[in-house]
């Protein structure tokens, strides 16, 4: 699974996921299913915000090619992927600027058009069950919840799906592709089933063997939204701008 993750996801997403796990004392080389889940959640969060802007009239528009006009504002503020201290700094700044209530838990995005925080969920189970779990945990009407599944289902607060159908279809297609690629490599069952995942983890801990090598050819899709946010994720010793691409899993 670890090799699959490193081949299937953009290197910057992989790096952010590794940092997030290490922040909580977790090892991505051992908890590989969780590693895959975090990478998937990050990519969905980034895809959710990608290409969406607000024009000078306050209208939400989509810009898919080239650099957006300077008058355009990113519709979504990305919170997911930042270290906790920076993430809370961003949340506090948004709350102070907009007057929205501060969430109890860190959300994934902020929607400047609808003036609300968004919690993104990606589940291997039934969407309504996961939605209820999220809602019960958050217990806040100010945080909008949007759940996606690997089977193409989705569920959102008050059936308000925020994005246009095409943008959501792109996310669903990506999730379905990840599922198919995992299944073709015999990884899906352990990823989808907690019991099977626990059994596989024990097996991996005993063997510490490497997974079969995967093809290295990948295709890149540039994300203009994340280009401008790159420096927010960088360590102080790094000055390069973040350029995240959304990768399709390599073909067999």
Curated annotation (Swiss-Prot):
<keyword id="KW-1190">Host gene expression shutoff by virus</keyword>
<keyword id="KW-1262">Eukaryotic host gene expression shutoff by virus</keyword>
<feature type="active site">
    <location>
        <position position="108"/>
    </location>
</feature>
<feature type="site" description="Important for efficient shutoff activity">
    <location>
        <position position="206"/>
    </location>
</feature>
<feature type="site" description="Important for efficient shutoff activity">
    <location>
        <position position="203"/>
    </location>
</feature>
<feature type="site" description="Important for efficient shutoff activity and nuclear localization">
    <location>
        <position position="195"/>
    </location>
</feature>
<feature type="site" description="Important for efficient shutoff activity and nuclear localization">
    <location>
        <position position="199"/>
    </location>
</feature>
<protein>
    <recommendedName>
        <fullName>Protein PA-X</fullName>
    </recommendedName>
</protein>
<keyword id="KW-1035">Host cytoplasm</keyword>
<dbReference type="GO" id="GO:0039694">
    <property type="term" value="P:viral RNA genome replication"/>
</dbReference>
<dbReference type="InterPro" id="IPR038372">
    <property type="entry name" value="PA/PA-X_sf"/>
</dbReference>
<keyword id="KW-1192">Host mRNA suppression by virus</keyword>
<feature type="site" description="Important for efficient shutoff activity">
    <location>
        <position position="202"/>
    </location>
</feature>
<feature type="active site">
    <location>
        <position position="80"/>
    </location>
</feature>
<comment type="function">
    <text>Plays a major role in the shutoff of the host protein expression by cleaving mRNAs probably via an endonuclease activity. This host shutoff allows the virus to escape from the host antiviral response. Hijacks host RNA splicing machinery to selectively target host RNAs containing introns for destruction. This may explain the preferential degradation of RNAs that have undergone co- or post-transcriptional processing.</text>
</comment>
<keyword id="KW-1048">Host nucleus</keyword>
<dbReference type="GO" id="GO:0075523">
    <property type="term" value="P:viral translational frameshifting"/>
</dbReference>
<keyword id="KW-0945">Host-virus interaction</keyword>
<feature type="site" description="Important for efficient shutoff activity and nuclear localization">
    <location>
        <position position="198"/>
    </location>
</feature>
<dbReference type="GO" id="GO:0003723">
    <property type="term" value="F:RNA binding"/>
</dbReference>
<comment type="similarity">
    <text>Belongs to the influenza viruses PA-X family.</text>
</comment>
<dbReference type="InterPro" id="IPR001009">
    <property type="entry name" value="PA/PA-X"/>
</dbReference>
<keyword id="KW-1132">Decay of host mRNAs by virus</keyword>
<dbReference type="Pfam" id="PF00603">
    <property type="entry name" value="Flu_PA"/>
</dbReference>
């Amino acid at each position: 699974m670890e090799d699959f993750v490193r081949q299937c996801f953009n290197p910057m997403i992989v790096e952010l996921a590794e940092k997030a796990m290490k922040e909580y004392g977790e090892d991505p080389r051992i908890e590989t299913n969780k590693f895959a889940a975090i990478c998937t959640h990050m990519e969905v969060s980034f895809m959710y915000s990608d290409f969406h802007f607000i024009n000078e009239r306050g209208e939400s528009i989509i810009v898919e090619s080239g650099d957006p006009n300077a008058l355009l504002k990113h519709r979504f503020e990305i919170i997911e992927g930042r270290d906790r201290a920076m993430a809370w700094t961003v949340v506090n700044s948004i709350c102070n600027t907009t007057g929205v209530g501060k969430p109890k838990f860190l959300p994934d995005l902020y929607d400047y058009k609808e003036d609300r925080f968004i919690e993104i969920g990606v589940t291997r189970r039934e969407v309504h069950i996961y939605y209820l779990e999220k809602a019960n945990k958050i217990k806040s009407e100010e945080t909008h919840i949007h759940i996606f599944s690997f089977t193409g289902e989705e569920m959102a607060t008050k059936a308000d799906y925020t994005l246009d159908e095409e943008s959501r279809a792109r996310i669903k297609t990506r999730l379905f592709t990840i599922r198919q690629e995992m299944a073709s490599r015999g990884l899906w069952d352990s990823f989808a089933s907690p019991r099977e995942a626990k059994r596989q983890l024990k097996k991996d801990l005993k063997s510490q063997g490497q997974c079969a090598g995967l093809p290295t050819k990948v295709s890149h899709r540039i994300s203009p939204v994340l280009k401008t946010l790159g420096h927010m994720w960088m360590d102080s010793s790094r000055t390069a701008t973040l350029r995240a691409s959304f990768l399709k899993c390599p073909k067999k």
